[in-house]
Amino acid sequence: MKINTKSKKVNKAWFNDHIHDTYVKLAHKEGYRSRAAYKIKEIDETCGLIRPGQVVVDLGAVPGAWSQYVRRRFAPREAGVGGAAAGELNGRIIALDLLPFEPLEGVAFLQGDFCEEAVLAQLVGLLDGRAVDVVLSDMAPNLSGVEVTDAARIANLVELALEFAQSHLKPQGALVCKVFHGSGYSQLVDQFKRTFRVVKAVKPKASRDRSAETFLVGIGLKSTGMPNADAV
């Protein structure tokens, strides 16, 4: 069988980059499940989103680094390796993903497809009538490499997150959503501007330079007839 040497070189280069990555090392040291924790950390520090006592929904939660970060914001830190959160949580975290989720104390997890109405109904049930302060979406589709197809898949997930946010966020609540630069990006920004009073695009330092991902942050739901959102 012929071996694709180019593919082997790419995989080896990725592995080398990964094991020497500053954020990978930091995540291991601080007890996070992935380097993605530092993406939401920077977004939170930039925008001031997450505070004790809130209700936070984490969409596309696996492996759980974002939920871990929120949990640490909701609980005291014990002295020890990684500064892991300990004690009773002051807040509610609900995580959802298609894939299995390693249990995390204080985090309610629902496994299922956010695109399915039955799963969405279960998620709403877990809220138990409480409005949401922050919706986090790190959801991403399986990419085909066909730009038009991928743009449509990305847009669909963003639109679903927007619909959920519009229905369940508090008036001053916030949505953080992963998007990708390319076809359809400007339309997604426009949708955020129509929905939120303040819209920010944040590319965290922990997001790899070669990655097209960025994060749209919408803060404060608009009422009909309000002027266009401020954008940064």
UniProtKB/Swiss-Prot annotation:
Identify its protein family.
Belongs to the class I-like SAM-binding methyltransferase superfamily. RNA methyltransferase RlmE family.
Q: What is the lineage of its organism?
A: Bacteria, Pseudomonadati, Pseudomonadota, Betaproteobacteria, Burkholderiales
Q: Which Pfam families match?
A: FtsJ
The gene name on file is: rlmE
The name of this protein is: Ribosomal RNA large subunit methyltransferase E
Residue numbers annotated as active site? 178 (proton acceptor)
Q: What is its EC number?
A: 2.1.1.166
User: Superkingdom of the source?
Assistant: Bacteria
Reactions listed under catalytic activity: uridine(2552) in 23S rRNA + S-adenosyl-L-methionine = 2'-O-methyluridine(2552) in 23S rRNA + S-adenosyl-L-homocysteine + H(+)
Gene3D superfamilies to which the protein is assigned, alphabetical: Vaccinia Virus protein VP39
| Localization, UniProt | Cytoplasm
